[in-house]
Amino acid sequence: MARLKVTQVRSEIGTKRNQRDSLRSLGLKRINDVVVKEDRPEIRGMIFTVNHLVKVEEVE
């Protein structure tokens, strides 16, 4: 299964509560934090919620 590398590139200050919750659920706390997650629908949904705050890359 593919994996996604998610990097937080913008601050969560001034964002809505659900966006902050999605960042925390992804394991992102501050700018330039990086996590690698499995490519699953629930992860894609969280990424879609915060797509303006993160950068996503596929990794092997």
From Swiss-Prot:
**GO BP: any one term:** translation
Sorted alphabetically, the keyword list is: Ribonucleoprotein, Ribosomal protein
Does the keyword field hold Ribonucleoprotein? yes
Q: Does the keyword Lyase apply?
A: no
Q: Which Gene3D superfamilies match?
A: Ribosomal protein L30, ferredoxin-like fold domain
List the InterPro entries.
Ribo_uL30_ferredoxin-like_sf, Ribosomal_uL30_bac-type, Ribosomal_uL30_ferredoxin-like
Q: Which GO terms describe its cellular component?
A: cytosolic large ribosomal subunit
Taxonomy, superkingdom: Bacteria
Molecular function GO labels: structural constituent of ribosome
Cite the Pfam families for this sequence: Ribosomal_L30
Assembly mode: Part of the 50S ribosomal subunit.
Q: Which NCBIfam families does UniProt cross-reference here?
A: rpmD_bact
Protein family (similarity comment):
Belongs to the universal ribosomal protein uL30 family.
Name of the molecule in the record: Large ribosomal subunit protein uL30
- The protein's organism comes out as Salinispora arenicola (strain CNS-205)
